[in-house]
Structure formats: structure tokens, C-alpha cells
Amino acid sequence: NETEIARENIDNVFGSQNTLAVVVPAGDYETEERLLKRLSAFPQVDTALGLANVEVKDGYVLTDALTPRQFSELTDMDMEICRLFYKAYAADREEYVRIINNIDVFKVPIIDMFQFLYQYVGDGYLDQGYITLDDDTRSDLDDLNKQINDAKEQLQSEKYSRMLLNLALPEEGQETFAFLDTLHEVI
């Protein structure tokens, strides 16, 4: 059969992958990170990809919670501007104690801060002159926002996060099905 021969030729040239999607409730980034690490440890898993291991820059991943100083260093934004963003984020979520206490110890996941920042930009606060960003900073933020949106589009919906596993197993067979049972127990 021509189709089988073509598939075999493709597999011989490019290799074959057995990709599996794991869907979990969204929002608990720390649990997702632990699960990805646990899944990656299995010898049957070549790679595991989820929001909690998508690198943004300088070793940080999308779900890392950063202080204003860390966010400032990541984005090359002025520290005072980052403090303002963190205060606005806290106020938006009615976490006023964060504003009154030391905002410098408040940590927000990168993905959440960027979504808030772009909502903030979209609402026109930057354009109204409350906060001014230079062109380079604005360009860097646009690039990071694109990365984040691409990852989120592929790996998260409103209620669920998707993790993609590339397995070092055939698509079917006893070993594969036994490993799927193991995955069900772990997840």
C-alpha cells in the first residue's frame, strides 16, 4: 500500500513521535510545575511541555512568580514603573494590604502580570501619560507579550491547561498502555 510505504519513508527520514496531551484544571501553576517535573522524570517521556516550563527569558518560565525588582530586571523596565504596575495589579484584585505593606515582596506570576499589563495598556493608561515607556521597552514588552500569547493559546484555555508529552514508546502496544495506566495514577 502506497500510504504505508510513504509513512514508513517519512518515519525513517524524520523519525516518529508519539505525542500525548494531558489536560488539567488551569490556574495552579505550582502544581503544574511539580507535575511536569514528575512526568519528565519517567524514562518513557522524551519531553514534557506546559506553561510551567516555557522559558521566557534569563531562565524564567511563564509561571514563575516575580517581585517588582525581578520583573524590572527581566523586562529592563524602571523599578519605580514596575512598583506602580504591581500596586495597580494589587488594587485591581482588591489586595490593598499588598499596597500598604511592602510591595517589593509581592510576587506575581509572569504570565498574570503580562496579561494585566496588556489590559492596562489596552485600557489606555499608558497613552494617557500616567506611565511612559520608551520605545525599546515598549518593543521588548510587545515581544514578550507575543511569546506569552502564543504559549497560552497552545497550552491554556479558560478552565484547563494542556501539557504535551512526547513519549519514547510506540503509539500502541502493551508497554504503551501500561504506561498510560501509570500516567492516570500520577495525574
Residue ranges and their predicted role:
Residues 111-187:
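Extracytoplasmic
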Residues 60-108:
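Charged, amphipathic alpha-helical linkers/stalks
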Residues 17-19, 36, 45, 157-162:
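Active-site lining segments that contact anionic ligands and/or coordinate catalytic metals
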Residues 1-24, 141-150:
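Solvent-exposed, non-transmembrane loop/terminal regulatory segments of multi-pass membrane proteins
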Residues 7, 11, 32-36, 180, ...:
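Extracytoplasmic/secreted envelope proteins and their assembly/folding machinery
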Residues 33-66:
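Short amphipathic beta-strand/extended segments in non-transmembrane regions
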Residues 29-37, 171-178:
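Short, conserved charged micro-motifs
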Residues 24-26, 167:
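Short beta-strand segments enriched in hydrophobic/aromatic residues
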